[in-house]
């Protein structure tokens, strides 16, 4: 929920190890360790203009079927705020305090954290995996205040049956929520950085957005390892505590991936959407969209000289 492809990619400098670390003695207990970092600037912000953001994530794999990770990001700098330099970077990285003064030069930044895990359940023939992701604003970890955080639990079943057509089908279900009745709109927002956790005016985190709850499901039938037909369903409810009149958004789609030849792939999707969001437009709205993509994979032969 902290970082997704819901928004335009951030132009950034990234450091990421290709293979996991195996640290003597420590990896005996924590298993393989992955560490990922990035630093870049955000676009489309007005209050303030041109802020920067950094993020880092640490994940460990203590057991064969269990993985857990923690992550954090911090938006800092921007027009009228502290300049972007090593001092403000390290202050944003290490500070545990907060500033409520709008435009304050000593503002540590807009900080948020995340906790995620993935567990492939035992005694299920390694076919069922449960997982969750989270987002917490101005908390050192989502577990520090579970009720303030947004959560996105999910389940993945790699095979619905042992043989026949069901053996070629997988199923995924997720139920994200960010609505907090006691503290509306706390996720993906900030008092000083008023454009919130966005890039090009789109939320960088989960598609569920601010103060909403919903669920999403995918049912996929695999024709071959490279070809499939997928049914998608998504429903979201916008809380009236933040948005006047609330709202509902529902969409259903069919996606097909087909290989026309070993080097050419056809990918197409049709989606139907129905939504009722009074603050945007009165009455029930409906729309249908479709797209087709053709991908060519050239065969490049390596020659030894």
For each of these PLM feature ranges, what is it?
Residues 1-12, 18:
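Aromatic-lined, polymer-binding surfaces characteristic
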Residues 12, 58, 258, 269, ...:
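Outer-membrane beta-barrel "beta-signal"
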Residues 19, 202-208, 253, 271:
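Extracellular/periplasm-exposed beta-strand and loop segments of Gram-negative cell-envelope proteins
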Residues 249-279:
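C-terminal structured domain segments
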Residues 243, 278-282:
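Flexible, solvent-exposed loop segments that connect beta-strands
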Residues 12-197, 210-217, 222, 233-242, ...:
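Signature for the C-terminal beta-barrel architecture of outer-membrane proteins
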């Amino acid at each position: 929920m902290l970082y997704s492809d819901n928004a335009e990619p951030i132009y950034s400098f990234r450091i990421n190890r290709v293979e996991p670390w195996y640290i003597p003695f420590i990896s005996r207990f924590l298993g393989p360790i992955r560490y990922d970092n990035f630093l870049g600037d955000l676009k489309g912000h007005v209050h303030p203009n041109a802020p920067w953001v950094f993020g880092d994530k640490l994940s460990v794999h203590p057991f064969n079927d269990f993985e857990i990770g923690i992550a954090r990001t911090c938006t800092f700098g921007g027009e009228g705020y502290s300049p972007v330099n090593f001092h403000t970077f390290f202050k944003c990285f290490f500070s545990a305090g907060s500033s409520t003064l709008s435009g304050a030069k000593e503002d540590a930044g807009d900080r948020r954290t995340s906790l995620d895990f993935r567990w492939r359940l035992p005694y299920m023939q390694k076919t069922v995996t449960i997982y969750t992701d989270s987002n917490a604003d101005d908390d050192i970890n989502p577990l520090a205040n579970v009720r303030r955080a947004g959560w996105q639990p999910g389940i993945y079943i790699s095979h619905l049956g042992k043989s026949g057509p069901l053996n070629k089908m997988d199923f995924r279900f997720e139920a994200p929520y960010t609505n907090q009745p006691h503290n509306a709109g706390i996720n993906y927002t900030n008092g000083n950085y008023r454009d919130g956790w966005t890039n090009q005016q789109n939320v960088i985190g989960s598609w569920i957005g601010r103060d909403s709850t919903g669920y999403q499901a995918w049912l996929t039938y695999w024709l071959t390892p490279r070809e499939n037909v997928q049914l998608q369903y998504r429903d979201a409810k916008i809380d009236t505590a933040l948005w006047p009149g609330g709202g509902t958004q529902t969409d259903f789609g069919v996606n097909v991936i087909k290989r026309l030849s070993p080097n050419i792939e056809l990918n197409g999707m049709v989606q139907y959407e129905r939504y009722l969001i009074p603050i945007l437009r009165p009455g029930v709205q409906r729309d249908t969209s479709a797209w087709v993509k053709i991908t060519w994979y050239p065969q490049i032969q390596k020659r030894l000289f």
